[in-house]
């Protein structure tokens, strides 16, 4: 008699990490050019045009969404922006 061994099926699930937004807040200290340069150095995926738009939105509306990404990356970008003396926060998107 032959014995057949069966292995239990293992269900693999991939969980999608919830998105977080990095928010840049306006300030009256840093120049517009400085903010654009800080954005470009802090968030590598941004281009010059995007950085300008984000800076102008933060300047006119008080805040602007820089990017949306997983939490760990959002924390990194926030910390980088803050290292340039900018005010940035993260919030769940």
Question: What residues fall within each predicted segment?
Answer:
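Terminal domain-initiation and capping elements
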Residues: 1-93
């Amino acid at each position: 008699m032959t014995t057949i061994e069966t292995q239990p099926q293992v269900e693999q699930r991939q969980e999608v990490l919830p998105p977080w937004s990095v928010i840049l807040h306006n300030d009256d200290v840093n120049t517009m050019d400085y903010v654009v340069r800080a954005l470009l150095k802090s968030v590598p995926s941004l281009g010059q045009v995007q950085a300008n738009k984000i800076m102008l939105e933060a300047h006119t509306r008080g805040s602007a969404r820089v990017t949306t990404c997983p939490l760990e990356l959002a924390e990194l970008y926030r910390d980088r922006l803050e290292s340039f003396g900018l005010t940035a926060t993260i919030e769940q998107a």
